[in-house]
Amino acid sequence: MEPVLALEGVAVPWELPYDTGLSGVSFALEPGELATVLLEASHPLTPLADVASGLLPPEQGRARFKGRDWAHMGPDEACTARARTRRVFAAQGWIDRMGVDGNLMLAEAHHTRRRLREIADEARGLCREFGLPDVPRDWPSEMREPDLRRAQCARAFLGEADLYLLERPEYASGPDLMPALSARVRGALGRGAAVVWLTTEPGVWRDPGAPTARRLRLSGPLLAEETP
């Protein structure tokens, strides 16, 4: 069985908007595996998720999704593959001139044949699960950061995917978010997805509330695995 995600000797030079580059990064995740990655609090913006989702080609090494090197995929194949990934972005990741509701449901509506009402009902349930009263209809610029983070979590778990890239999903949202977030991660793992959870919180890194296959620590551009 091919790993869901495999990074092999990945190197990315440092450049803005990131706080650091990557050097010799290698790890793989099988279906149903979770990796938590501890980031330095002073350098939380890393290109790791962009590389893992095929948005940033590494200068050296390979990034493979379900056995296919992102660098060898054509635009259509990469788009189809990326539809099987979900993400909570370190930055906002919103289309500015679209309501949060449209942002939240756009990918699922575009990449599946599900009825819009079905998608909207699931989105509403997820928003409530993550502590919002309903699917927000505000512009992203009109919402508070904690509520946007909750909406990002709802968007990430709308529908199903093979790979979840969660960049500090708990950031600015308070401890009440964690039970719902951990439950959704456990559900994704149970369906055979792989999850990468990046965090600056040592407590979350050690115990994200879900079985953890790998604990990784990013120090500058270097990624090291912590042994039990």
Model-predicted segments: where are they?
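Q-loop/switch helix immediately C-terminal to the Walker
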Residues: A91, R97-H110, E122
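Conserved ABC ATPase signature
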Residues: W139-D147
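ABC ATPase C-loop
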Residues: A156-F157
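Helix-to-loop junction immediately C-terminal to a conserved catalytic motif
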Residues: S53
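Conserved ABC ATPase "signature" region
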Residues: E118-V135
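Conserved ABC transporter NBD signature motif
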Residues: G61-A71
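ABC-type ATPase nucleotide-binding domains, specifically the catalytic core motifs of the NBD
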Residues: E15, M105-E118, E129
